[in-house]
Structure formats: structure tokens, C-alpha cells
Amino acid sequence: MIKFAVIGVGTFGIKRATAIKNSNKAKLVAICDLNKDNVLKAQKILKVPFKSFDEILKDNEIEVVCICTPNKFHKTMIIDCLKSNKNVFCEKPLCRNLDEAKKIYEFS
């Protein structure tokens, strides 16, 4: 079973996290969001622990990080995840511009 963490559990993130939680081939092991209300709502629905982004990056159990944050954070988060040997699923758009996309490509 593939172990996931979801970063950003607002409108899209909660939907993505719910789909992962309901999959018989994946396990949702952590959620993360800077908005405390989003975290509390997601924990109530999903019954999954909160972890900070740094904790998720250091957690060897987590194989895939699903990034559902505002677009301005995508590039940095993707690269940080890749540096930590995490697989990444990122909501669209991948990033804000071609330069950011090139940096992600160059790192990967």
C-alpha cells in the first residue's frame, strides 16, 4: 500500500485526501496546512494526524506527497520533496511560469 501525505487541505486538498483515504491501494498517513481551521476540519473528516511540512519530509514512511497548496508554493515544495526522495503529485498548474518549470525539471 502506497503511503501518502497531503499538503494543503483546503477545498481541493480535502477532496484529494478523501480520495486517497478511500482507495484500497493507498493509505493517507498525514495532512498539513498552515490554516488551523482547515486542519481541524480535515482531521474531523479524515481522522488522520497533522504533521508539519518538515516532519513529512523527514518521515521515511511517507512515499508520496500530494501538493494542494496555492500555486506560488508549488516550485519550492516540489523541489524540497524531491530532495527528500519523495514522489510528488502536484495539483495544476505545476508552477507559475516557464522558469519555475525549468528549475523543477533541472532538479528532477
Model regions and ranges:
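N-terminal Rossmann-like dinucleotide-binding module
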Residues: 1-46
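A generic structural signal for well-ordered alpha-helical segments
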Residues: 42-43, 81, 108
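Beta-loop-alpha module in the N-terminal Rossmann-like domain of NAD(P)-dependent dehydrogenases
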Residues: 48-105
